[in-house]
Design a protein with these regions (language model features):
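Membrane-proximal N-terminal amphipathic helix
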Residues: 1-17
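Functionally constrained cores in energy, signaling, and assembly domains
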Residues: 7, 18, 72, 87
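Short, charge- and proline-biased low-complexity linear segments
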Residues: 15-25
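Residue-identity detector for glutamine
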Residues: 18-20, 51, 89, 100
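Type IV pilin-like appendage domain
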Residues: 23-84
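Short linear sequence signals and composition-biased patches located at protein termini or domain-edge surfaces
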Residues: 78-103
Length: 103
């Protein structure tokens, strides 16, 4: 769904990383722009997977995040060029060329 589309659209060297959200790890899509480096962060917060767009290096502000889906689960792994994202709805996979941070 949405997470896979954002990841696929930003698949470039150093674009996908693992961060730390308020309730566990976050999937971070890094986007360098002329005005600065921004991050789209996906993470679990109060029974929802949320999406937050912020300046890189800034703190997490879940109250400003947008709900992606209701879920008590959010996990992801990367192996052999494949990013697997798991929520209560199941697991979606995206083939990637690049991944940083050994997630």
């Amino acid at each position: 769904g949405l997470i896979c589309n954002v990841v696929r659209a930003n698949d470039s060297k150093g674009a996908i990383a693992q961060g730390q959200g308020p309730e566990g790890k976050s999937l971070v899509v890094v986007e360098p722009l002329d005005s600065g480096t921004y991050e789209t962060r996906f993470y679990l917060y109060e029974g929802k997977v949320v999406q937050e767009y912020s300046l890189a290096g800034s703190g997490y502000t879940p109250e400003k995040a947008t709900e992606v889906t209701a879920s008590d689960t959010f996990d992801f792994s990367y192996s052999n060029g494949l990013l697997a994202v798991t929520t209560d709805q199941g697991t979606a996979e995206v083939a990637l060329r690049y991944m940083q941070g050994g997630a």
